[in-house]
Every structure is written in C-alpha cells, then in structure tokens.
C-alpha cells in the first residue's frame, strides 16, 4: 500500500482474495489513501487449492453480496465483480455472478487468453463457445451493458478482438507478467490500430513491481522483441503510445481521466528529476522519457487525485 501511494499511480483496479474480511480491509486502506480504485473479491470454486476454494456456488454468491453491500460505505473505493477466470468458476457460479452484476450494476474484471493451454482448457469447458471471450459473453460477463476489464489478451484472435471492440471491453496489457510467465507478447499496436480499448497494468505478483513507469518501459521493450522475432506486421510501441496506455488508455475505464483537457478530472503527479544527472540540457520530452526509464517513487514529490492532494 505504501508503495502504491508513493508511486505514479492515481487509479487502479485490483484483485483481492476470496475472503470478505481481507477484501474489505484492503478497501478501507485504499479509501484512506485518497486513490480512486476498484477492488474485487475474487470468486473461484474449482481447479484451485482447497484453502482458496469457495465451498459452494450459493455460499460464494452470499459472500459476494455481503461484500458488495458492506462496501457501500466507501466513496473512493468501489467493488468490481471478479471471477478469477473461467477454469476456476463453475458454470452455475458464472451465471449467478451475472445476475449479481445486473442487480447491483457492477463492472467486471477477469483474465482472457493469457496462454495457449488456458485457451484450450476453456474450449474443453465451454465447447459451445466460439472463443474464450465468447464464453464470457454467454455468461453475461463480457461488457456491452456493463464496463469490463480483461487482463492479458496475449493470444486473442480476430473474432475475440471483434467481440471486445463491440462490447467496449478494456484490455489490461500486462507486459512484465506476460514475460515472467512466458505467456508471450500481446500485439498491442494492432489492438490500438483496430480501435480496441487498452490500458496498462502491473499485475502484481505476476509482475514484480507496482510502478506504471516500469510497466511502460516493459511494454515498449517487449513490443520491440515481438516485432523483431515474431511478427513484423505489428509495429513496436512508440513512447507516445506507451504513455497513452499508462494515462488515457487505462483512465478511460474510470471516466474522463488521464489528460489535461477540459472536463477531465485533475489527476496530477509532480516529479523531481534533478537527481537524474545529464551533461546536456534536455527538452521536456526527453526529460519525460528519461523519467520513464530511470525514475522510481523517490522522484514523486506530490500527487493529486481528482484535484485532491493525496501526497
């Protein structure tokens, strides 16, 4: 929590745990921090360790509803439905969560097409689906009439990409996690060229750090390797596009966030780059690029979220 508060992040969507008390405690800490966040009590009732498995669909739904209603007291920290992913949730639980979503008007977050074995597994579990994303759609948990974040999407095919575009699903690109787990590298430039919504994620603990600056660097580097070694029809990410992912791309999920524009909420991070020595005078653009590659939370001096000073 301390690292997140002192980082460049102003808003986040977070996976918690299956446990209601722990999830509410996390939400209390985030509420005190001044950040604007969504937090999900994770649902999973199969294909996971017993100590992290919800004992039944009915109990999972009761716990989820109790958590949602207990979270109504928070102003800056909101609940988001979080089925871990299809392999860890039975069909009846997924349908029940869809009903909860409709009843409480909640957004949804989960995982999608992170690796090939996962995609094949979902096809076995949901043989009527046309693709992984279509399985979520059939359960009523894939955007359209609600906001939805899907993490990774490393191997999303054309049909899945079209479904995400049609339903306004936001892709949470998690480059370091995808590298650490040998999942692959998502074709982010293609997503953007095709009009999909994409933001940047750190995916702790698949990733090693909460820094969105580091995530920008990893996104650029991974895209260059993908271009060189896998598919030169998909250009590497430019710095401008990586910066967009870290600001307006992810910020769109929260509303008008991520830019200095009329009508946008004032999320501002003030950084001091004086410790990053350089023998020449640099332009503002060069200084910003240098911050992304070299800075950490020690360079953060002040932070404002929706105009309120939080650091």
Each language-model region and where it sits:
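Divalent metal-binding segments
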Residues: 1-22, 87-93
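Alpha-helical segments flanking ligand/cofactor-binding loops in enzyme cores
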Residues: 2, 28, 95, 161-162, ...
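Divalent metal-coordination and catalytic microenvironments
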Residues: 8, 30, 81, 111, ...
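Metal-coordinating catalytic core of metallo-dependent amide/deamination hydrolases
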Residues: 21-154, 159
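Short, acidic/turn-prone active-site loops that include or flank metal/cofactor-
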Residues: 42-45, 114, 175-179, 204-206
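His/Asp/Glu-enriched, well-ordered alpha-helical/loop segment
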Residues: 134, 138-144, 189-277
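A conserved active-site cap/scaffold subdomain adjacent to cofactor or substrate pockets
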Residues: 157-159, 165-202
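C-terminal cap of metal-dependent C-N hydrolases
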Residues: 265-311
């Amino acid at each position: 929590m301390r690292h997140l508060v002192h980082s460049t992040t102003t808003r986040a969507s977070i996976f918690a745990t299956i446990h209601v008390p722990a999830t509410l405690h996390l939400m209390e800490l985030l509420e005190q921090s001044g950040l604007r966040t969504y937090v999900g009590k994770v649902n999973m009732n199969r294909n996971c360790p017993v100590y992290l498995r919800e004992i039944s669909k009915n109990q999972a739904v009761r716990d989820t509803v109790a958590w949602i209603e207990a979270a109504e007291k928070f102003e800056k920290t909101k609940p988001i439905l979080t089925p871990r992913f299809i392999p860890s949730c039975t069909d009846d639980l997924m349908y029940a969560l869809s009903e909860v979503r409709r009843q409480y008007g909640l957004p949804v977050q989960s995982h999608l097409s992170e690796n090939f074995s996962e995609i094949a597994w979902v096809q076995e579990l949901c043989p009527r689906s046309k693709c992984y994303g279509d399985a979520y759609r059939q359960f009523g948990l894939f955007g359209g009439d609600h906001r939805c974040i899907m993490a990774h999407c490393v191997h999303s095919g054309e049909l899945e990409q079209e479904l995400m575009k049609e339903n306004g699903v936001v892709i949470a690109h998690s480059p370091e996690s995808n590298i650490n787990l040998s999942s692959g590298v998502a074709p982010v430039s293609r997503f953007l060229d095709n009009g999909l919504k994409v933001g940047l994620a750190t995916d702790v603990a698949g990733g090693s750090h909460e820094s969105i600056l580091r995530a920008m660097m990893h996104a650029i580097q991974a895209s260059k390797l993908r271009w060189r070694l896998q598919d030169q029809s998909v250009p590497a990410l430019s710095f401008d596009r990586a910066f967009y992912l870290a600001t307006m791309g992810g910020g769109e999920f929260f509303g008008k966030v991520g830019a200095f524009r009329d009508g946008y909420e004032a999320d501002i991070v003030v950084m001091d780059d004086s410790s990053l020595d350089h023998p020449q005078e640099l332009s503002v653009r060069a200084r910003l690029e240098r911050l992304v590659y070299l800075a950490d939370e020690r360079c953060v001096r002040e932070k404002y979220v929706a105009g309120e000073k939080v650091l």
